[in-house]
């Protein structure tokens, strides 16, 4: 009996040592006990500017105050953000998603223009939508490809846009919200060129202008900024997706943290703080998504 009990203790100790290298995801109570909310953010468009501010930075700073804790920003990227949140790598095999490995948990939530995608929903909890988006096909201004005229049928518009690519080259960043696999662009004869010089999605337009490919993909919030920054140098061909939603991502083990965030989001939508953030970081975007902003998401 003593030997069996001793072995149980040894096994439990070994398990504890194994888990100590990878912090456990925390829910609301643990975060309040700790006194700090760790925001995993990715430098992207005006969601996280890299200068200490951004739509999602201020959004989560307000949430930290709402739940009575301090705020800490932790920089990550689209390739490691989920691992930094869950302590495991996400491996996609077709429609199946698996979690593998054991890594330190670095943050409590992801907020950085993070798109709600079906495969991500298998391993994450998402908040209520925080922002609208849509993925667009973009070319250099001198490209012979013409922007589609557009119609009231989004599926027809998407098909017409994709047809413009043909077998041309498309600059892509796999395993991000702009992965061509998410939009039926793999296995279609397109010359897919992976951008691997950096994990920064903001570098795709400079690469496009440098001639790395004939097309690339942008989402609407990023495209609005790039059309201003690169005036007269790029053009939108058309959509490759329907309207999408961006949201804050939480571990499956943090339902109370998500509930508290949704409560906070509802409050700031009602009292005008949300609208002020939209106007500060994305003025003019309401005309692209009038139904989202008029309906409260």
Tell where the protein language model's regions lie, with residue ranges.
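Short glycine-rich His-centered loop
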Residues: 27-55
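Bacterial N-terminal signal peptides
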Residues: 8-20
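Periplasmic-binding protein-like
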Residues: 42-43, 130-138, 144-145, 203, ...
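Acidic, polar ligand-binding/catalytic clefts
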Residues: 57, 61, 65, 70-159, ...
